[in-house]
Amino acid sequence: MKKQIISLGALAVASSLFTWDNKADAIVTKDYSKESRVNENSKYGTLISDWYLKGRLTSLESQFINALDILETYHYGEKEYKDAKDKLMTRILGEDQYLLERKKVQYEEYKKLYQKYKEENPTSKGLKLKTFDQYTIEDLTMREYNELTESLKSAVKDFEKDVEKIENQHHDLKPFTDEMEEKATSRVDDLANKAYSVYFAFVRDTQHKTEALELKAKVDLVLGDEDKPHRISNERIEKEMIKDLESIIEDFFIETGLNKPGNITSYDSSKHHYKNHSEGFEALVKETREAVANADESWKTKTVKKYGESETKSPVVKEENKVEDPQSPKFDNQQEVKTTAGKAEETTQPVAQPLVKIPQGTITGEIVKGPEYPTMENKTLQGEIVQGPDFPTMEQSGPSLSDNYTQPTTPNPILEGLEGSSSKLEIKPQGTESTLKGIQGESSDIEVKPQATETTEASQYGPRPQFNKTPKYVKYRDAGTGIREYNDGTFGYEARPRFNKPSETNAYNVTTNQDGTVSYGARPTQNKASETNAYNVTTHANGQVSYGARPTQKKPSETNAYNVTTHANGQVSYGARPTYNKPSETNAYNVTTHGNGQVSYGARPTYKKPSKTNAYNVTTHANGQVSYGARPTQNKPSETNAYNVTTHANGQVSYGARPTQNKPSETNAYNVTTHGNGQVSYGARPTYNKPSKTNAYNVTTHADGTATYGPRVTK
């Protein structure tokens, strides 16, 4: 527990040194390129197309982030997990550096092309050279992508196997069930609330205010951030938290010289909130102070940790030439952590040892210019810190990860009392390591410095920073993978849609169906003309697809201006085109329009081409005729549907007469007669005793349903 709290600054470094958007300072490290599992020859394979590359890079980026998130899990901070975490981190850094090297090569080529362009176009001002962090990888082969993906997957699986072995050997690291975790959390919260009761009782007391503020700060460090508290997920974490909280309470009473009561009432916000339940709050303060006043010294023989005897309380020696960690809170006077009473005094009382020990002579050195191309490993904090170049890291669409350590997330509130005997309290924001201030005059700040407890390479992984962008919304969602990218650079995942979810087509024309299967539409054609296939599906120039109308069903027949009639059953019949006394004319497709408006169709020009069957099983014969085969049935038996259409085992289709089912001939409302053999004959359209009528195109419909065409109207 404590080893994680005091090394937050060190743990942040590994997260901030990510390849694709590296604007942070880097630490000089070893070369991880040999750790990559990508074959050297894979870069010579087939390149991923430009329109598909961005989505693959996004998917690959999310894999890196997920792997890092595993390392930042709170309960993996125990020393038993160190080797497994180092192994996984090495693989992550190896694959990350492979991408960095590829990007460096491509960027150098890009600069040469830009220089050549400027020489050929010296007056051009519109095109500017991109910096390295603005430049994105433009060439990646499918083999490289697949090998990177598989490498990260196998690394995570190996880590999970190592974790399982570790937890089998150390039973106190076995994860709690949900019920066990809830009970453990309740026990820890109860003890923390007792500490808060002591804090509220003495924070307005001028004599003991500094110790009360320090008590609150230590409790907050143990519990974690208010918006992301530490999970009590196993037995060891629970025991360490309870021990830490008990020792924090004991430290308060030893440093103040007060006696610890045998029982302290726990703070309950539903009863003791200083604003909403001020009477209950004052009653709790009074009860706690009275319990402390009436307590004896018997508690000193039952302390959680051993306290050494000393005649003088010596303050901690101030450190020189510290390099301030980006996660450490900033204070007015840079005071040391308060571990004893302010003044040295003669006493035989036990001296409280600091919960958070400040390392002597930690991070030192000077800031210098970094190398041209940095690597990514957090080698050690005991060395020279150099300024890294502007090569970008993984976070393409958001700020550098290191930026977040200068702006901590919203902390737990600290209750700051007003001067004198006033009972009003004010809640003010507090940093992760807590800024503890007096009210007026003298400063009693408490600075909790991070400490590097491990100096081996790639062994420190801190909690991932929380982005400070608001509001949070989904920037992009991939329907094929279910991955959501948020505006703050984080990612979310969901299961493939199945069953009651509708089909969904993403920007790449990939459709995820209800059953979770995926179908792929045509790739965008880019500047190709729109094309409609035999199924009335049109692929447009931008790659989008539109579908023709379904049968209208139960709608009345309708004839448009071109004499094309859509019947109630969805069928379409074509009337003669108005000829207006024009002679017969045959167009380029061998379709002849006669003088009476009738149309006859000749064979399509064959141009001596052989028969050809396209991907939709539509065959164009040598004489220009077209036959439509069914979709291949793949060795299925012959099958006849309700319309008497038989699909044979070889995929061919034969059409029988429409079944008449021994019904007599029948004429419908449109004067269309279906005979007993299934044939259909068409009578004249019913006129309903209407007189002859001539429309705007000089076409006259007579009482018997026939039509005559007059000359075109000349204007």
Curated annotation (Swiss-Prot):
Keyword Cell inner membrane tagged: no
One annotated GO molecular function: peptidase activator activity
Keywords linked to the UniProt accession: Prothrombin activator, Repeat, Signal
Pfam hit, one: Staphylcoagulse
Family: Belongs to the staphylocoagulase family.
Domain observations: The C-terminal tandem repeats are not required for the procoagulant activity.
Its biological purpose: Staphylocoagulase is an extracellular protein which specifically forms a complex with human prothrombin. This complex named staphylothrombin can clot fibrinogen without any proteolytic cleavage of prothrombin.
Biased composition (Basic and acidic residues): 306-327
Segments of this protein annotated with the region Disordered: 306-348, 430-470, 674-697
Descriptive protein name: Staphylocoagulase
Keyword Signal: yes
InterPro entries recorded: Staphylcoagulase_N_1, Staphylcoagulase_N_2, Staphylcoagulase_rpt, Staphylocoagulase_N
Protein's organism: Staphylococcus aureus
Sequence repeats: 495-521, 522-548, 549-575, 576-602, 603-629, 630-656, 657-683, 684-710
Biased composition (Polar residues): 431-443
Signal sequence extent: 1-26
Sequence segments annotated as region (8 X 27 AA tandem repeats of A-R-P-[RT]-[FQY]-[NK]-K-[PA]-S-[EK]-T-N-A-Y-N-V-T-T-[NH]-[QAG]-[DN]-G-[TQ]-[VA]-[ST]-Y-G): 495-710
Source lineage: Bacteria, Bacillati, Bacillota, Bacilli, Bacillales
